Design a protein with these regions (language model features):
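Conserved N-terminal phosphate-binding loop of PLP-dependent enzymes in the Aspartate aminotransferase
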Residues: 1-351
Length: 351
């Protein structure tokens, strides 16, 4: 009676649901879960590895520490596993927060801080406050992200937004044939022209470009590796940061730990294939990771007092949830120990 109860009909039985099956608590009906809690479920319900660690999960849930300032051995153990299993060696700066939208928010704040400080070092003031983004993008429902998200208008209309440059999203059409390739290359050229126009109009005001490796809510839109290579080249040429929003595409759902790890010369199916890996400067993560946040690379360190080195420049009360971190640690260990990425690839090829 106190909430907008417009969700699905089944009542989730937390104890009896199992594997990929949701059990309705009212009558025991089982439903094959094709929803996976908005892609946040990773190893199903009541996985044996989770159940083996019920006591640990219960213990860390009894009190919620403020991890920005108070550290625990469980936090350190989680970071060890995260580093070992999922953090790329080119993204070693880490920040945790609760919520995927807030993860993106802080990616943007890092970029604004980086660009504005660079401008100030050159004597340029009041510049570095815009984000390039794409049509049909979904990056969240919070402050800055409202200016990026443009899928269902009900999620953004009537809320104040920034007028940041919105770029054509040159996604592939399937099946991929000669005409589809001609069409997508034309759309890529248009997108690059729009990016260059925004840069030419105000060359010092673009802090970053953000893109989902695969647009999820926008329509399951896939892009060519060649396009990501163009974005990387433009980011280096025009001195803005390249952000991949991996909230929905991370932690194995594509057969790689992160979707952008498919963008390699050996895996690229473009003609010709890309020559270099278009690695991001920042990625945002959430959903399957349980705890949300960002990873950032070496370009951030081009600014001495960047947001990762200045105390409280980016921060939150809790710095993520310790319970979520411990659960994510167990998930990562399960993905690693059961070789689930290989299983995802094999299943994907079969389908």
């Amino acid at each position: 009676r106190n909430i907008l109860a417009d969700g699905f009909d089944p009542i989730l039985d937390l104890e009896k649901s199992h594997d990929s099956w949701i059990v309705d608590k009212r009558d025991g009906t089982e439903f094959l879960d094709m929803f996976s809690m908005y892609a946040s479920g990773c190893i199903g319900y009541n996985h044996p590895k989770i159940l083996e660690n019920k006591d640990l999960l219960a213990n860390v849930s009894l009190f919620k520490p403020t991890l920005s300032d108070i550290y625990t051995t469980e936090y350190a153990d989680f970071l060890d596993v995260f580093n070992d299993v999922a953090i790329p060696d080119y993204l070693k700066n880490t920040f945790f927060i609760e919520g995927g939208g807030l993860a993106v928010e802080n990616a943007l704040k890092v970029a604004f801080d980086w660009k504005v400080r660079k401008n100030l070092s050159k004597g340029i003031e009041n510049k570095g406050y815009k984000i390039l983004h794409f049509k049909e993008a979904f990056h969240g429902r919070t402050g800055y992200t409202l200016s990026l998200t443009n899928t269902d208008p009900i999620k953004t209309k009537y809320f104040p937004k920034f007028d940041w440059p919105r770029i054509e999203n040159p996604y592939l059409s399937f099946p991929i044939n000669d005409q589809a390739l001609i069409d997508v290359k034309q759309k890529e050229e248009l997108a690059v022209e729009q990016i260059k126009e925004a840069l030419n109009n105000d060359p010092n005001d673009i802090a970053a470009l953000i893109i989902e490796p695969i647009q999820g809510e926008g329509g399951d839109n896939h892009f060519r590796c060649q396009f990501f290579q163009k974005l990387k080249d433009l980011s280096l040429e025009h001195d803005f940061l390249l952000i991949y929003d991996e909230v929905q595409t991370g932690i194995g759902i594509t057969g790689k730990m992160w979707a952008h790890q498919h963008f390699t010369p050996s895996l690229c199916q473009c003609d010709p294939p890309i020559k270099n890996i278009p690695i991001p400067d920042i990625i945002s993560f959430g959903k399957k990771t349980q705890v949300c946040g960002i990873l950032a690379g070496d370009r951030i360190n081009e600014v001495e007092n960047n947001a990762f080195k200045t105390s409280s420049r980016i921060n939150s009360t809790f710095g993520g949830s310790l319970t979520d971190m411990v659960r994510f640690k167990i998930i990562l260990e399960t993905v690693r120990d059961l070789n689930l990425l290989e299983h995802v690839n094999n299943t994907g090829n079969y389908l």
